[in-house]
Amino acid sequence: MIYLDYSANTPADPQVLDRFCSVERRCIGNANSHHQAGTAARAEIDAATLKIAALLGVQPAEIIYTSGASESNNFALKGLARLSRHAGRHIISTPLEHSSVSGTLTALQEQGYEIDLLDIRRDGTVDLDHLKELLRPDTIAVAFTLVDSELGVVQPVEEIAAILKDYPNCHLHVDATQAVGKIPVSFEGVDTMSLTAHKFYGLNGIGLLLKRRNLALEPLIHGGESTTIYRSGTPTVALASSLACALELAVENLPERSASVQKRNAELRAALFQHPEVRINSPENAIPHILNLSVRDVKGTVFQRELDAHGVCVSVKSACSSDGLPSRAVFAVSRDRRNALSSWRISLSHLTTEAEIQEFLRVFDVCCQQLTAAHGDR
């Protein structure tokens, strides 16, 4: 099997697994308990929180542990909406968002909130002039993904944050799920930010919501203080510690890992450009970890299934998106519905080898000949 779907899930790093197992065996107490075992568990989770805070440049009190980015996005957007409901009910986002953002905004819209979506430029970035046009005194939030999961485009967070300084009632939420471990991530100028460990070689089931200390969101789970007043319950100490380990590895090894991925991406682009029926949808300014393409007149779902039959794992859209619909992200940059329906995504890792790329290209050639010939026969 050749795995080229690292944007959907990454394998846990062996050091992360070792950390989890070690802490799980050693810390048997409830971190909320006032005895030796509880104190030891509390010390472990406090150490993890301090490490995470240092790596992300935030204060420990700004860290909320969650089950993952979907929970973090829901928590942030619903919390900001409720917090600011007396100041306004207008929210701005983009058509590129993960379903945990777009779905939450749809739910808020049904509660009377007004949602506007930003125009997307042909390079995949948001139209900042359109943002300025949409902003109003009653705009309470702008929400966008830092790195698009389908195209790999990086949004200009610093410029967006600068624009919002003139709107004191407006908060900025950033979904950094696909960014951590791929590009440097800063919380500067941001009010809330979501991320999840399983995207940077950590374990499933643990994520973070970063929240400015001065924001008093309604608790996600009521019942008393745990690691924070915002999410009651017994903290999973080993998961928190494993996230800190994964984050440390991701930050420390970012330059080396990115260089490896850039090399694999260049090999792919050079080979795929030789196919006249292939259209590369990811712009040149996209991160190298994500390469989105379309094969003319062959639906992305069809090509993905054929590759899977040959032992190659790729994705059509985000793993959490609905099947059968064209990619919103690809349509936004190409304005071509057929092209969007034909699109699929290769996502790379520092673990991806040159041999895997060469084998993928061999399989791709076989699938491309079969599927384009089948279309031509109709």
Model-derived segments and their meaning:
Residues M1-R378:
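Pyridoxal 5′-phosphate
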